[in-house]
Amino acid sequence: MRVDEEPEFLTVENPWLYNERNVSCIPKGVYNIRPHKSPRYGLVLAVDDVPNRSHILIHAGNTAADTKGCILVGERFGNVKDMRAVMQSRFALNRLLSMITEPCQMEISYGYDHG
């Protein structure tokens, strides 16, 4: 993940599964993001206007098993229970939240092009 064109964070998402809710990564595109208080995860970033999806968040977690279609951020890659993971996720999320305090836009530019 880049902030102001500079590499800042590593991410983990589920693979492309045809934008199926709760299991697929989100499609390429430009999305509005904003700080959001989640009952489950606390202060996170909400990703708005994802086609046919809702409640997409950028939150802390380590592996794709920790997400249901959301984006996880971390400081470095590692392994958890033999799965690829991002590490220092809470630290990375807090750092990201300190950079993004107002609504802004995020572009997903790598991954599956849904058409």
Language-model regions: role of each:
Residues 1-104, 110-115:
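Cell wall/extracellular polymer interaction/catalysis modules
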